[in-house]
Swiss-Prot record:
Belongs to the RNA polymerase subunit omega family. Promotes RNA polymerase assembly. Latches the N- and C-terminal regions of the beta' subunit thereby facilitating its interaction with the beta and alpha subunits. GO terms for cellular component: cytosolic DNA-directed RNA polymerase complex. The RNAP catalytic core consists of 2 alpha, 1 beta, 1 beta' and 1 omega subunit. When a sigma factor is associated with the core the holoenzyme is formed, which can initiate transcription. InterPro entries: DNA-dir_RNA_pol_omega, Pol_omega/Rpo6/RPB6, RPB6/omega-like_sf. It comes from Deinococcus radiodurans (strain ATCC 13939 / DSM 20539 / JCM 16871 / CCUG 27074 / LMG 4051 / NBRC 15346 / NCIMB 9279 / VKM B-1422 / R1). GO terms for biological process: DNA-templated transcription initiation. Keywords: DNA-directed RNA polymerase, Nucleotidyltransferase, Transcription, Transferase. NCBIfam families: rpoZ (TIGR00690). This is DNA-directed RNA polymerase subunit omega. GO terms for molecular function: bacterial-type RNA polymerase core enzyme binding; DNA binding; DNA-directed RNA polymerase activity. It catalyses: RNA(n) + a ribonucleoside 5'-triphosphate = RNA(n+1) + diphosphate.
Length: 99
């Protein structure tokens, strides 16, 4: 991202630390399947979720501390999703063993 974009992002938070935490949390949400607020043409340019999270914040469509997904709900959803993935892998392994 350009330096002017970083400066804009820093103005949204009270510290560089908070900006990095918010960006990391949003990148994790995106990784776990949370929908992006960016138009499709902007999402296609990068597969880097940290950059995508920073772009989302820079557009103003996400506001720090207000409309990011609730952290507890996000964690519960992530755990359920991961458990389902592991169960599917286990079932596939059991199926292969039967063959």
């Amino acid at each position: 991202m350009a330096e002017k974009d970083i400066d804009k992002l820093l103005s949204l938070t009270d510290s560089k630390y908070r900006l990095s935490v918010v960006t990391a949390k949003r990148a994790l949400q995106l990784r776990s399947g949370a929908p992006s607020v960016l138009p499709v043409e902007q999402r296609v340019r990068t597969h880097n979720l940290v950059t995508q999270a920073m772009r989302e914040l820079a557009t103003g469509q996400l506001t720090v501390g207000t409309n990011l997904i609730d952290e507890q709900r996000f964690h519960q959803d992530y755990v359920r999703q991961r458990q389902a993935q592991l169960q599917a892998q286990l079932n596939a392994e059991r199926e292969r063993e039967r063959d």
